[in-house]
Amino acid sequence: MNKQELHDFIGFRQPNICQIVAYKDGVEVYTDEWNGYKKDDTCHIMSATKSIVSLLIGIALEQGLIKSIDDKVLDYFPEYKVKRGEKTIYAITIKHLLTMKAPYKCKGDPWTKVCSSEDWTKTSLDLLGGRKGITGEFNYQTVCLHILTGLLYQTSKLTTVDFANKYLFDPIGIPNHVNYYAETAEEHKQFTMDKSPKTNVWFCDPLNIGTAGYGLCLSASDLAKIGVLCLNKGIPVVLVNFFLEENV
């Protein structure tokens, strides 16, 4: 099968694919695009954003901004006031958030409650914990993972996009990104669901903290560079080896 035959096959059989990049021996050897996309266009990678945020946490760990993923979440939010009667939140660690084993007081993702607030990190912390305690059960979350990017800001004093640009994107040749904030709920929905090409943006809250569970826009080429980075054990970006191994 030649390139044109493959292009036609994917265009007919896989309408959701917009870009493909292939590497061999660390070198890009094949690219193609569909659905009006160009090579440098980005798309909303949705929940794959979680994996990128996990890498940023690993970088912060290597830099000593975070001491351990076993640290309690509240250690990094000393100004946060825990509500009366809440006990579980004190025991929740960064690892609980990263592995989707943190308990919450809500069922499902509280999109409206978090995204209509002025401080998404604080609102997410308000929902962390609950009466059931830490059960160790898998509990998939998207919105409330905002705590992780809030934690990055607490430790680095850099917004999510600035931290990513400086310590992840720049070193491996990914274009600098900027914040994108939706003024209305409709604009928010349009951003998350629209499949048309996007630019180099990261969705953020009113305080310019990037969303941790969704919202990052990358091209297939960008994602391939991150994949090569992981295969190269974090070089040239400095990442803790055991952290990479756990993520993989």
Model-derived features: where do they sit?
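Active-site SXXK
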Residues: G26, H44-I69, L97, L148-L152, ...
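The feature captures the short pre-catalytic strand/loop hairpin that immediately precedes
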Residues: D32, K122-G130, P197-L207
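Active-site helix/loop module of the DD-peptidase/beta-lactamase fold
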Residues: Q63-A102, T155-G213
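Acidic, glycine-rich loop-and-strand cores that form catalytic or ligand-binding grooves
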Residues: V238-V248
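Short alpha-helical patches at coil-to-helix transitions and adjacent helical residues
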Residues: A48-S54, A91, Q141-L145, A220-L223
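Extended ligand-binding groove/face enriched in aromatic
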Residues: H44, Y76, V82-K132
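A short, well-structured edge-of-sheet supersecondary motif
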Residues: H7-K38, I69
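Catalytic-site signature segments of enzymes, centered on catalytic residues
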Residues: K39-D40, K107-A185, I209-L218
